[in-house]
Every structure is written in structure tokens, then in C-alpha cells.
Amino acid sequence: MAHPNPASTPAPLYLTGNKDGLRDFLNKFDVFLFDCDGVLWSGDHIFPGTVETLELLRKNGKQVVFVTNNSTKSRADYCKKLQSLGIPSTVEEVFSSSYSASIYISRILDLPKDKKKVFVIGETGIEQELRAENVPFIGGTDPAYRRDIQPQDYKLIAEGDSSMLDSEVGVVLVGLDFHLNYLKLALAFHYIKRGAVFLATNIDSTLPNSGTLFPGAGSMSAPLIMMLGSEPTSLGKPSQAMMDAIEGKFRFDRSRACMVGTGKLGGTLGVLTGVSSKDDFVSGAVRPHAYLDKLSDLLESGL
């Protein structure tokens, strides 16, 4: 999708220290969707004023939703992380890419009755959310798939032998998998070639950790994209599919929802505590509507 010409896009409002501007901005929205890492915390360090800012929003009747592309954790696991950092939260306030994918498969995809099973490349977070939606699956953390491919496997896969390929698989779902191997990729490729829907929890190419970058969930999909010559439907942020799923669950007016983030992918409110600089927000190809030095600057609104 082509990005808008920066010259034709209004410069974002800088709201830090602008009490009236902050109050007017907050009053435009009923729902606040939070990117977490870089907005609420960095690593295991919560930013000062985060809890108080969330309390301010809730006190003023705003709905708070925590949005994450982390597919390795279930919503319950992610809620525990929030609470361990001192952030009050409930499972229903968490919307993860693994949950988004599970909702999409169970409630939106119209799969044939004999093709309801999902082949998973990913970790327990995906499995827990699929299980909660009563979606049958294979692969994932099953030790049977954590092995080298054997010479006889090629012929069995090519022939569609039931010992290698399950005829009931109608979806291949790819997330971050710490045990990705040739066998999993070969099976995923042949399921998709046989008509399975190609989905990804998210397409982030890298995963930040310990001050550097590691392969992300998008890097798990990359070999399949190369083989197939086609892209998966992504169920993570900032995809339209994830926004549709969030809107469907929480039943809000999208024009009254504020997405708070750190990246260069747009959103409503940007903060400078993550990966973006002021120049990115002011001169970048995709700009937020407004930005702050840090999230806790919202406390200056006096609401």
C-alpha cells in the first residue's frame, strides 16, 4: 500500500505541556488501544506515571485495551505480565495476535466441514487461544514435529500420505516458533499448496530483546512466502484484519478509538519512548495525529 505524501499530510500536534490541547484530544476518544513495549514499559521496566495515566483514563470512562503482537503468550499469560509490572488489567482487556488469529479462524473464516483443523507453526500462546475457541490443531509444540526430515518423508509428503499430511487441515497459521525446522516448513508448504488458508499471527521481521534484534514471527513466514510467491493474511497490528477483530469484540465506533504506539506505522497518538524520534513523527511517510514525549504527559490534562 502506498504511503501518503508527507508534504500533503498535516504535521502532528505536539501535546506535551499543552493542557488545553491534551484535554481536547482526550475528549475526542472513548477507547484507547495501547501498544505495550515502548509505550507502557521497556523490557521489564515500567515507565514512571504509567499506572496513574491508565487510572486517569479509566476514571474518565475511557475503555483501555492492551494490544500485542506477541503470539508466544496467551492473553492470560500476558495479563500476568501486566500485573507483575503493577498494571491493573483483566484478560478481557488484552488483545494479542494469537487471540486475533483464533477469533478470525473460528468466527470469520468459512471453512468446509472436513477442513476445520489448523497446522500451527508457533508456541503455546497460539495453542491456548485456539483451544479456547474450540479450534482443532496439530503441529505447534508437539515434539513429533521437532525432528529432522528423513529421506522417506519426501515421498510420503509428495503422495499426501496420511502419516505425514492430515486431510482435515484447512489452515496453516504461522507465528513465532523457537523450534522452526525444515520438516515444519515442508509440511506447511504442502498444506497450502493443497488449498489450506495461509495465515500469520503477525509479520514483524524482528524481535527486540536485550538491546538488540532477533528473528521475529515474520521471519518464520518468509521462507513460505518465497516458496509460494504469495503473502499470508496477517492477524497482528497494524493489519486491517486485527482492527476488524478488535472492533468486532469491543463494539466501539472506530472514529472514537485512539491507537497509542511508538512506531512509524501511523496510529493516533505517538510517544517518543520507543523506536521513533521526533523527526520520524514530524517528517515521516506515515504520521500520528499527535505525539507526546511520554505517555504520562497525559496527566497534564488536568482531567
Regions found by a protein language model. Name each.
Residues 2-36, 41-62, 71-95, 102-303:
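Asp-based, Mg2+/Mn2+-dependent phosphohydrolase catalytic module
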